[in-house]
């Protein structure tokens, strides 16, 4: 029997895609801020050509997560996870947290020149 769809996978995919989209820019700054150094940090720029693909994947995953989480409770059968109010509230909070992280990650390359 398959597990019911609850939007958790789409949230994870959106967050992962956002991290990958900003890895070329945010990664080196975070590593330098943590005290790491070395020429290998420059190798993260190899991900730059794939940034539009990662951005698209993040936005598509967030759209599907939003569609699954914000759907009406009437679409849920009684006893399913999506019918429990506390779980719905938790998923909505996690969704908005991930959405803000995605926006920060997507906007970071435009703010990055102020730090270097």
Swiss-Prot record:
KW Cell membrane (keyword) present: yes
Gene symbol of the encoding locus: merT
Disulphide linkage map: none
Name the UniProt record assigns to this protein: Mercuric transport protein MerT
Keyword terms of this UniProt record: Cell inner membrane, Cell membrane, Membrane, Mercuric resistance, Mercury, Metal-binding, Plasmid, Transmembrane, Transmembrane helix, Transport
Binding positions for Hg(2+) per the UniProt entry: 24-25, 76, 82
GO molecular function: mercury ion transmembrane transporter activity; metal ion binding
Task performed by this protein: Involved in mercury resistance. Probably transfers a mercuric ion from the periplasmic Hg(2+)-binding protein MerP to the cytoplasmic mercuric reductase MerA.
Principal location: membrane
Source species of the chain: Acinetobacter calcoaceticus
Subcellular location: Cell inner membrane
Topology within the bilayer: Multi-pass membrane protein
């Amino acid at each position: 029997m398959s597990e019911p769809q609850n939007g958790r996978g789409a949230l994870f995919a959106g967050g992962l895609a956002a991290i990958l989209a900003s890895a070329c820019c945010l990664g080196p700054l975070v590593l330098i801020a943590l005290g790491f150094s070395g020429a290998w940090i420059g190798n993260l720029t190899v991900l730059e050509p794939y940034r539009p693909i990662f951005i698209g994947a993040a936005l598509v995953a967030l759209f599907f997560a939003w569609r699954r989480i914000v759907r009406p409770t009437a679409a849920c059968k009684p006893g399913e996870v999506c019918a429990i109010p506390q779980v719905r509230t938790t998923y909505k909070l996690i969704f908005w947290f991930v959405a803000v992280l995605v926006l920060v990650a997507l906007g970071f390359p435009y703010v990055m020149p102020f730090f270097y």
